[in-house]
Amino acid sequence: METTNFGFVASLLFVGVPTIFLIGLFISTQDGEKSSFYSDSSKGRLGPKR
C-alpha cells in the first residue's frame, strides 16, 4: 500500500514540522529570550535593529 504509506508520511510531516518549529521557538525564547522577533514583539524595549 504505497498510497497509505504516502498519506501517513505526508500527515506526519504536516503535523510534525510545525510542532518541532514551535518547540524550538519555545526553547529559544525560554533560554534567555535570544529570539529577536519574539522579544521585539512582546516587549518593544529590546531593539535588535540598531
Curated annotation (Swiss-Prot):
The chain crosses the membrane at residues 7-27. Its main location: membrane. The keyword Transmembrane applies. It is a single-pass membrane protein. One of its GO terms (biological process) is photosynthesis, light reaction. Keywords: Membrane, Photosynthesis, Photosystem II, Reaction center, Thylakoid, Transmembrane, Transmembrane helix. InterPro entries: PSII_PsbM, PSII_PsbM_sf. One of its GO terms (cellular component) is plasma membrane-derived thylakoid membrane. It is found in: Cellular thylakoid membrane. NCBIfam families: PRK14094.1, PS_II_psbM. One of the components of the core complex of photosystem II (PSII). PSII is a light-driven water:plastoquinone oxidoreductase that uses light energy to abstract electrons from H(2)O, generating O(2) and a proton gradient subsequently used for ATP formation. It consists of a core antenna complex that captures photons, and an electron transfer chain that converts photonic excitation into a charge separation. This subunit is found at the monomer-monomer interface. PSII is composed of 1 copy each of membrane proteins PsbA, PsbB, PsbC, PsbD, PsbE, PsbF, PsbH, PsbI, PsbJ, PsbK, PsbL, PsbM, PsbT, PsbX, PsbY, Psb30/Ycf12, peripheral proteins PsbO, CyanoQ (PsbQ), PsbU, PsbV and a large number of cofactors. It forms dimeric complexes. HAMAP family: PSII_PsbM. This is Photosystem II reaction center protein M.
